[in-house]
Amino acid sequence: MKKLKPILLLCMFLAFIGTSCKKSSTNPTSAVSMSLKFNGTAKTSNTVAADYIKSTGTLQVIGKFGNEGLSLMITDIKVGTFAVGDIVIATYSTTADFQNTYLGSTGTVVISSFNSSTVTGTFSFAGTTVDGRNGTVTEGKFSAKVITQ
């Protein structure tokens, strides 16, 4: 019985090691990121979300830069170039309470790739706040995981 105990412990240890090891994924995950310049100041973020509402074909991409944030809402989403103001609503807020939000009036959003799991693209637009201040978003790009509703 004394010889059986070490063998049993060794078997339990090997079983534990064999089941606790996890294989690394062979599929690399896409990076989630957004970068842009607002009025010439560079901003980058890894806090990005993309919500796809399948029934309406609408995609909303949101990026957070501390207390600031950007939102792109695109209707009838597909790979292609879209004009801000037509089927794209683009906003940039410089405060967490959205009191200083620039609503895009001109610009473009280019969707480079879009599928059930990821979306990537570029964007630029000019916008105005409700009190008439102007702002520009340039050199925008994003990569996000898609959540389908």
Residue ranges and their predicted role:
Residues 3-6, 16-40:
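Bacterial Sec-dependent N-terminal signal peptides
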Residues 112-149:
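C-terminal or internal capping secondary-structure element at the end of a domain, subdomain, or sheet
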